[in-house]
Amino acid sequence: MNYFNVAKIVNTRGLRGELKVISYTDFPEERFKSGAELQIFKTEKDEVPVQTVTVKNAKEYKGSFIVTLEGMNSINDVEKFKGMILKVEEDQLQDLEEGEFYLHQIIGLDVIENDQKIGTIKEVLSYGPNDVWVVKRPNQNDLLLPYLKDVILNVDLEQGAVQVSVPEGLD
């Protein structure tokens, strides 16, 4: 079964079992709604969840979320989860509009410029206002491409390719 990151549990809050989480999802209103089921993993790379939990309630708070889980009413119930990752199963992913995609769908796609394959997407970095796509190139250093409409021209998931225009100086 495939799981996808939703948030990182960064701390507890108060004594009543609240968790402070940093959201990784574009759909926090869906992921943290009352009754939503989430899986807790020790690390992002783990393949088996530590526990499956149900959201009791959540609220946005200073750029993060305060989440309470069903059946966990004290700090003693949740303290063990600090530093762990919240994930959802693949079948819980939202349907996207045409032309939209999940980042995990582009990892491994061929990168094409002027009908020539220049590499494959290795990872996506999300540090600033734009994501940066890391392109693994044969016998060269990785290429860092900002996710801008003038650089990333087309993403074709069916063909497994991304059309790009590499600006001068980035090569």
UniProtKB/Swiss-Prot annotation:
Superkingdom per UniProt: Bacteria
Keywords: Chaperone, Cytoplasm, Ribosome biogenesis, rRNA processing
Entry's localization field: Cytoplasm
GO biological process assignments: ribosomal small subunit biogenesis; rRNA processing
Pfam short name (any one): PRC_RimM
Annotated ranges, domain PRC barrel: 98-170
Protein family according to the UniProt entry: Belongs to the RimM family.
Family matches, as NCBIfam families: 16S_RimM (TIGR02273)
Function comment: An accessory protein needed during the final step in the assembly of 30S ribosomal subunit, possibly for assembly of the head region. Essential for efficient processing of 16S rRNA. May be needed both before and after RbfA during the maturation of 16S rRNA. It has affinity for free ribosomal 30S subunits but not for 70S ribosomes.
Domain comment as written in the entry: The PRC barrel domain binds ribosomal protein uS19.
Protein name: Ribosome maturation factor RimM
Organismal lineage: Bacteria, Bacillati, Bacillota, Bacilli, Lactobacillales
